[in-house]
Amino acid sequence: RVTARVGLGRGDVLDIERTVKLGGPIHSKGVLILGGFLRGRFARGDPLSLSASLVFEQSYGGIEGDSASLAELLALLSAIAELPLRQDLAVTGSLNQHGTVQPIGGVNEKVEGFFDVCAARGLTGQQGVVIPAANVKHLMLAPRVLDAVRGGHFAVYSVAHADDAVRLFFDREAGEA
């Protein structure tokens, strides 16, 4: 679970994992890229008067990689807009400064892992996983997952841009209040 808090500040995004030496360099780079995205989207004419913090709650081991940077962006946008995120969707994806969602490793394991958790708790037909569009060609999901998707009990969504994920998680277009 990723959480974010925001307030007035100087455009800084504090990576708590890095500060306490639990975040590796690739994860830290991903958080810095989020700052670039936010500045490009919200501070093209004026400074970004924002201070934000990001953390993986109850994580006590090392965090490495950038496959959660889309999730971190969604957590930040939720905190900024004071809008809740859908909790029945998981998300994975790397992000560049322009909002393009980039491929990640282990896509099958990530989809199947969330599916198994949902199946153990009871499929509702609303649950699903959001993955990078560039990873669709890598999908080789287990028959149990394919059957649930075909039956409308679980979904796998692909996104090419952060705005596509905003649509799914907030049920509105990017930029709408």
Residue ranges and their predicted role:
Residues 3-22, 26-177:
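Peripheral, non-AAA+ core regions of ATP-driven protein-machinery
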